[in-house]
A protein has these predicted regions:
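N-terminal secretory signal peptides and thylakoid transit peptides that target proteins
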Residues: 1-20
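Exported/periplasmic ABC-transporter solute-binding proteins
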Residues: 25-66, 77-82, 86-89, 101-102, ...
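A generic structural motif
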Residues: 68-74
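Short, glycine-/small- and polar/acidic-enriched structural segments
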Residues: 118-127
């Protein structure tokens, strides 16, 4: 797990996000070669990515297009990792799949939805308990979350964030399955949602006191604060794997984009600005 001191910099990073993003974009644009670009054939890519990547990926795509002007993107699909798999299995077209769960990517691989040898781990994330800013809540453990009488929201078991949350709650006896799915809650009745973004919205609105979400979600949803960082030892590592889809007719361009996401300094800057760490 990344250093817990990251929580001290979340609000600062959020406030600096707009200016640093523009700086990265300017750097990419100034470094592009118009002569090389002119020789490239136009290509359009379709990206399927986990919902928690929405803002970061949109930001990255805009920067990518400044140095790759021959590449355009269809409306990227941002859904839960399970829903993305279901769409691909139903025949939807995509060039690149990025999941918020190694398990969900394993399923995609087992069903032949991705080109196996293109799979690579791209990003890591952390799991946190969040509340509205200036909540005044003093929480030092998951046991406090469970026993403190708080209204809690978590993702349901169809989404990776929900699985990670339930694995964590299992560690304090508040969920019955160590795998984070197929069990039931003990002593609590959390509000369940099929989107980790909606969990954040429930906290924002005051419908619940606390939510278990990704660290990166606090960069997407203003007005929230971290009240507890959940140790990685009580849940699976949060890894975002990416791969080329077997449906892709533009695998060379898709591979170039994946390589850029993983290795380019401006891309890495974008992911970090939105709260992700590189895998």
């Amino acid at each position: 797990m990344r250093s817990l001191t990251r929580r001290d910099f979340v609000s600062l990073a959020i406030s600096a996000l707009a200016s640093t993003t523009l700086a990265a974009c300017s750097s990419q644009n100034s470094g592009s070669s118009s002569a090389a670009n002119a020789s490239k054939d136009p290509v359009t890519l379709q990206i399927f990515a986990a919902n928690s990547l929405t803002e970061a990926m949109d930001n990255a795509i805009e920067i990518y297009k400044t140095s790759h002007p021959w590449v355009s993107f269809r409306d990227s699909q941002y859904l839960s990792s399970g829903d993305l798999n279901a769409q691909l299995q139903s025949g939807a077209y995509a060039d690149v799949l990025i999941s918020a769960s190694a398990d969900k990517m394993d399923i995609a691989q087992s069903k032949g939805l991705i080109v196996s040898d293109t799979r690579r781990d791209l990003f890591n994330n952390d799991l946190v308990v969040c509340a509205r800013q200036n909540s005044g809540y003093r929480i030092s453990s998951l046991a406090d979350v469970v026993s403190g009488g708080y209204k809690l929201a978590v993702g349901d078991e169809s989404v990776p964030a929900g699985n990670y949350a339930c694995q964590s709650l299992y560690s304090v006896g508040a969920y019955t399955s160590a795998e984070g799915r197929g069990g039931f809650f003990v002593g609590i009745s959390p509000l369940l949602d099929s989107s980790v973004g909606n969990v954040c919205k429930h906290v924002q609105s005051g419908q619940v006191d606390l939510g278990i979400v990704y660290l990166s979600d606090l960069y997407r949803f203003p007005g929230l604060e971290i009240v507890y960082e959940i140790p990685e030892s009580v849940h699976d590592r949060i890894i975002y794997p990416g791969a080329i889809c077997t449906t892709s007719s533009k695998q060379e361009a898709a591979q170039e984009f994946l390589n850029w996401c993983k290795n380019d300094t401006d891309a890495i800057s974008v992911w970090q600005q939105w709260g992700f760490a590189m895998a």
